[in-house]
Structures are given as C-alpha cells and as structure tokens.
Amino acid sequence: MTDALPLVLVPGLISSPRIYAPVIPALWRLGPVMVANHVRDDSMAAIARRILSEAPPRFALAGHSMGGYIALEIMRQAPERVGRLALINTQARPDTPEASARRRTMITRAKEGDYHGVVDELFAGFVHPSRQDDPRLRQLVHDMAEEVGVIGFIRQLTAIMSRPDSRPTLTAIRCPTLVLTGDTDNTIPNSLSKEMADGIDGSWLVVLENCGHLPQPEQPEETAQALMEWLRG
C-alpha cells in the first residue's frame, strides 16, 4: 500500500460528487478521498478559501473543468499545501466577453424556469459525439444538475465569469502536475490543456481517445489509471 497524500477532488460546472464516482473506488485504495463542495460561494477566491478550510493540512488536488479553475486559485492561495496537482479538461484563461455573455443568458433562463433546457444544451457540448444519445450519461448530467440546483448553478456561473487569468501563475507551480483531457472536448478544447502543460514545468499531458469533456464517466478506466499513476508518482 502506498503512502499517497489525501486526495481532494473538485467537480466542475453542474457537477456533484457523482462525476467522480466511476474513479473513486480505484483512487480510494491509495488513500483518503474527499470531494469538495463548490456550490456555496460565488467567487473563485471564496470557494478556494472554503475548500482549504475543510481540506487536510497537505493534500493532492484534482480539479475538473470549473474545478480546475478552483484548483488554480488554491495554488495561488496556498501552494505549500498542495503536494500534487491534476488539471482535468480545464484551462488557465479567463472568460472571454462572448463566453460571459452566454453565461448571463444561461442565468436568465435558469431564473425563468428553463434550467433543464440549459442543462440539455450543456450536455450536448460535454460528451463525445458518439455518446450524444447515451441515456446513462444524459441521466447522470441531469441528476447532478438537480443536486447542484438553480441557486448553486448561478453561483457557479458567477464565479466562472469573474475568474482571473491563471496563465501568468503557471510557472510558479512546482509540484508534480498531470494535465488530462479528451481528444474531442467541445467545451474546453484540448489545445488549452496543452497550453497549460507547456506552461507548467515538469508537467505531463494525457489525452484520452474517444473522450469529450467528462472523462470520468466517458473513459473511467483510462481516467482512473492516469490518476493512480499521478498519485503514485
């Protein structure tokens, strides 16, 4: 049994702990696993502070999508507490004006009762084209969205829109870092994952085949294997 650091997993937009369910059994064998709550605050700084207040003194940190934005904020606030970092289907860039405009429209629609319609549209960009008609994946995304709720969703979008540009801070990351993405991510193009990997000294990039924005349920075995290798060092 390895002496792996405790692991803190941070989900993404409209994602609950369920997003990590396909990989937790494998990761749990290596050490304690905690899934962070990221729906109680509406800024990256506040979300990161809350996670740090609840996390072990020193830990491995993995963030998926929005969770990657949060992970990069944690690296700004307390880099000495993070022994390993995994950035999954995420990016270091801030929101573009066009992306923020789309998010404001989503907030309006969710407030007006079209939350499920918004979730359906997000799902279409989340999964690999071959999985668009996968009822299991669609149900998973809708179940998670229900758990996050409209208020949590609005908080998440508010935090995402105001996130800082993390590209200038990538060179300060010194811990072993995995950058993982899918070959067909239509939400955050894998070119942006490659950009992060290029900016973090000593990091390594894993691109999963036949995978969109949700590698944990889309390619669970490959995702778990990559994360286990990262944890074991």
Question: Model regions: which residues?
Answer:
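Conserved HGGG/HGGXW glycine-rich cap/lid loop of the alpha/beta-hydrolase fold
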Residues: M1-R50, H64
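Flexible "cap/lid" loop of the alpha/beta hydrolase fold
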Residues: M44, R76-Q77, R81-D120
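Gly/Ala-rich beta-loop-alpha elbow adjacent to hydrolase catalytic centers
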Residues: G63-G67, A71
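Conserved alpha/beta-hydrolase catalytic His-Asp/Glu region
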Residues: D95-E98, G113-A172
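Short beta-strand/loop motif that positions the catalytic acidic residue
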Residues: I173, V179-T181, D185
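Short alpha-helix in the alpha/beta-hydrolase fold that links the catalytic acid
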Residues: C175, P189-D198
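Catalytic histidine neighborhood in serine/cysteine hydrolases
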Residues: K194-H213
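Catalytic histidine-centered segment of alpha/beta-hydrolase-like enzymes
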Residues: C211-A224
